[in-house]
Amino acid sequence: MKINPKNGIDKLIFGMKQNDVIALYGKPNRNYKDEDDNVIFAYNSLKMRLTFYKDEDFKLGYIVASSADMELFGNKIIGRTISDVKAALAQKGITKFTQEDFDTFENYFNEDNWIIFQTEFDEVVKFEIGAIINDKDEFDWKFKG
């Protein structure tokens, strides 16, 4: 599955509605609401959790994924060391990361692309990507369906 910075993952494009996603991947294994009443879809086979924002008319705005099949710029990311991933990203001009530490986990956040690499024991175990917020402080929805 190809990660498309600022747009989504694979066929998932930020701004899609729940029915658009179901048309592509079928019904999710889990469907629930979080503490903010956002709708969450979880797909076991894809190893993805999708968030549809309540305040944005339930548009797809955030994806958390841990599938070993994911690729960013042609490189797999899950299971690789964060230094390898960051070196590959540097070749594409992505060099600025904010690091947060939590017990054995670290998050490496790049705000320009709204991506997070979560590591444990120096290895990428999870990837998060969110819809971009533009200069007007609004979401830049990419899906035009």
Positions of PLM-derived features:
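Extracytoplasmic Gram-positive cell-surface binding/anchoring modules and repeats
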Residues: 12
